[in-house]
Amino acid sequence: MAHKKAGGSTRNGRDSNAQRLGVKCFGGQLISAGSIIVKQRGTKFHPGKNVGCGKDHTIFAIVKGKVEFKKKGLKKRTYINIIN
């Protein structure tokens, strides 16, 4: 009879799921109210006109319209606006 002894154990073999962060709607794109524009950690992008910010810093549209990215201020922060 063929014999195979027990294999050793390993401490590897785990991996976390991707977080799927990033820009979901780009500049000039038409979107509806409630659509997610950016999923992010921290505020790389800041909410502007007609845009809201969730507790996990997700930027979303409040009204239907066109997405606009604008750099503003001394620190050149990127603000996202919706033009309707």
UniProtKB/Swiss-Prot annotation:
A Pfam family: Ribosomal_L27
One GO cellular component term: cytosolic large ribosomal subunit
UniProt keyword annotations, A-Z: Ribonucleoprotein, Ribosomal protein
GO BP annotations, alphabetical order: translation
The keyword Ribosomal protein is annotated on this UniProt entry: yes
Claim: ATP-binding is one of the keywords in the record: no
InterPro entries in the cross-refs: Ribosomal_bL27 (IPR001684)
GO molecular function: structural constituent of ribosome
Family: Belongs to the bacterial ribosomal protein bL27 family.
Protein's recorded name: Large ribosomal subunit protein bL27
Species of the source: Buchnera aphidicola subsp. Acyrthosiphon pisum (strain APS)
Species lineage: Bacteria, Pseudomonadati, Pseudomonadota, Gammaproteobacteria, Enterobacterales
Gene this chain is encoded by: rpmA
